[in-house]
Amino acid sequence: MARFALTVVRHGETRFNKEKIIQGQGVDEPLSETGFKQAAAAGIFLNNVKFTHAFSSDLMRTKQTMHGILERSKFCKDMTVKYDSRLRERKYGVVEGKALSELRAMAKAAREECPVFTPPGGETLDQVKMRGIDFFEFLCQLILKEADQKEQFSQGSPSNCLETSLAEIFPLGKNHSSKVNSDSGIPGLAASVLVVSHGAYMRSLFDYFLTDLKCSLPATLSRSELMSVTPNTGMSLFIINFEEGREVKPTVQCICMNLQDHLNGLTETR
């Protein structure tokens, strides 16, 4: 059996986020001043977390957010980040660089709901979901392979699994679940993975967790909250568990969703 922690963070605010202009993949906008502050606040919030892996979309806003997080880490400042195009935002085709209101008008003209509508040259929701599944399955196989190698190397030696207190893998606030449910105590973690990505992409990935993998949710979290767009630098934590072995789909437990405690008191730049 192997399990790992997965922390997913949306990038910080850009000028186009604030102005409600669609970026997608074709508009590589940097963080705004507020966005850099958000990334720094996220880094301070996560500075005690011992991440073992870091993955980011290869777009500028996610790269800058990842840098803002890791440069404030007590343990991960020198960690190598793997930039992966599978973590990019949904491609919006002809409406990239245009106002969100234009996308809504096009969807209305096509008599479709905005999230479902695919503008010319854009990705369908299914295409975005398949990218997310492809990355997630790659990540799971990577962690399982590394866990097997560690087990072979350390046979006869004390376990080298990560510390499994949730306080060690995520600084949960008072209003969130404080432990992982387990029938056999608190099993070790093979890894703690940080991913920085984008709002529409994350919503699609979380839908896969909920719909296909039957992700369990905290009692205080509703399905609508799970499917809402994550705010800039909002954080979500999942425990991915291969208790039935690698040939069976993992179980997914959501510990918290769209957490933004780190933004309390942050002054927005005008």
From Swiss-Prot:
Protein name: Fructose-2,6-bisphosphatase TIGAR
Catalyzed reaction equations: beta-D-fructose 2,6-bisphosphate + H2O = beta-D-fructose 6-phosphate + phosphate
Feature type site, description Transition state stabilizer: H198
Quaternary structure (record): Interacts with HK2; the interaction increases hexokinase HK2 activity in a hypoxia- and HIF1A-dependent manner, resulting in the regulation of mitochondrial membrane potential, thus increasing NADPH production and decreasing intracellular ROS levels.
One example of a Gene Ontology biological process annotation: negative regulation of glucose catabolic process to lactate via pyruvate
EC number: 3.1.3.46
Subcellular compartments: Cytoplasm; Nucleus; Mitochondrion
Record-linked Pfam families: His_Phos_1
GO molecular function terms attached to this record: fructose-2,6-bisphosphate 2-phosphatase activity
One Gene Ontology cellular component: cytoplasm
Substitution effect: H198A: Abolishes the ability to lower cellular fructose-2,6-bisphosphate levels, to inhibit the glycolytic activity, to reduce levels of ROS, to increase oxygen consumption and to protect toward hypoxic cell death
Protein origin, superkingdom: Eukaryota
Induction: Up-regulated by p53/TP53 (at protein level). Rapidly up-regulated by p53/TP53. Up-regulated in glioma cell line in a p53/TP53-independent manner.
PROSITE patterns registered for this protein in UniProt: PG_MUTASE
Function: Fructose-bisphosphatase hydrolyzing fructose-2,6-bisphosphate as well as fructose-1,6-bisphosphate. Acts as a negative regulator of glycolysis by lowering intracellular levels of fructose-2,6-bisphosphate in a p53/TP53-dependent manner, resulting in the pentose phosphate pathway (PPP) activation and NADPH production. Contributes to the generation of reduced glutathione to cause a decrease in intracellular reactive oxygen species (ROS) content, correlating with its ability to protect cells from oxidative or metabolic stress-induced cell death.
Organism: Homo sapiens (Human)
Alphabetized InterPro entries for the sequence: His_Pase_superF_clade-1, His_PPase_superfam, PG/BPGM_mutase_AS, Phosphoglycerate_Mutase
Record PTM N6-acetyllysine, positions in chain: K50
Keywords assigned by UniProt, alphabetized: Acetylation, Apoptosis, Autophagy, Cytoplasm, Hydrolase, Mitochondrion, Nucleus
